[in-house]
């Protein structure tokens, strides 16, 4: 799929993509899903991450990640939804606290598509505890290792399990827990706190 350009359809050519319109992504995803819906979902993960990086990322972040996403070297996933919050992202509870040059992430996420397979998480957390609405949120480009034969989440500070679904073979969903999971400060999208909801 990466050789066909599926993961970089709308990424600009200067970052290794094909530079096509959103319509192309929709058509390709629909056609792949017609054969196997789980495969059709793969390109959309890359689409979400690339869009966030293009909209809000620094030039250094664009250069670091977009080429690798377009080539399929990096497989990203969106880590937004939470238990009891669902898609009401303005009120999410997962926290990120800056300590020295890294953020410590604590909290829980759910319904994370391809969570164990991914190398990179677009991770939405609350970095300002004094704000309880969308203004206190920040987006991170959080790197992690892929699953192993023994563990879904071998990274220090991560745990979780698969959510069994009916009828959507191949598109695996996960619960993820963070316990002082470390993200370098330079992986804050756009290198500015409080812009997470704007990026969405």
Spell out what each predicted region is.
Residues 24, 146-162, 172-200:
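A glycine-rich, basic-preceded beta-loop-alpha segment at the flavin cofactor/substrate interface
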Residues 72-80, 124:
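A short, Trp-centered hydrophobic/proline-enriched beta-strand micro-motif
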């Amino acid at each position: 799929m990466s050789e066909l350009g599926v993961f970089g359809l709308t990424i600009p050519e200067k970052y290794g993509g094909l530079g096509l319109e959103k319509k192309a992504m929709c058509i390709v995803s629909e056609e792949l899903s017609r054969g196997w819906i789980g495969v059709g979902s793969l390109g959309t993960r890359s689409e979400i991450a690339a869009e966030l990086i293009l909209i809000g990322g620094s030039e250094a972040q664009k250069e670091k990640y977009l080429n690798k996403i377009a080539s399929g070297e990096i497989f990203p996933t969106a880590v937004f939804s939470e238990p009891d919050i669902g898609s009401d992202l303005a009120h999410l509870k997962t926290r990120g606290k800056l300590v020295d040059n890294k953020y410590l992430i604590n909290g829980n996420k759910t319904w994370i598509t391809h969570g164990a397979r991914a190398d990179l998480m677009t991770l939405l957390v609350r970095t300002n505890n004094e704000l309880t609405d969308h203004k206190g949120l920040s987006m991170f480009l959080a790197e992690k290792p892929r699953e192993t034969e023994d563990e879904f989440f071998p990274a220090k500070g991560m745990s979780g399990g698969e959510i069994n679904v009916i009828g959507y073979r191949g598109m695996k969903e996960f619960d993820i827990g963070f316990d002082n999971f470390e993200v370098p400060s330079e992986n804050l999208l756009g290198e500015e706190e409080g812009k997470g909801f704007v990026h969405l």
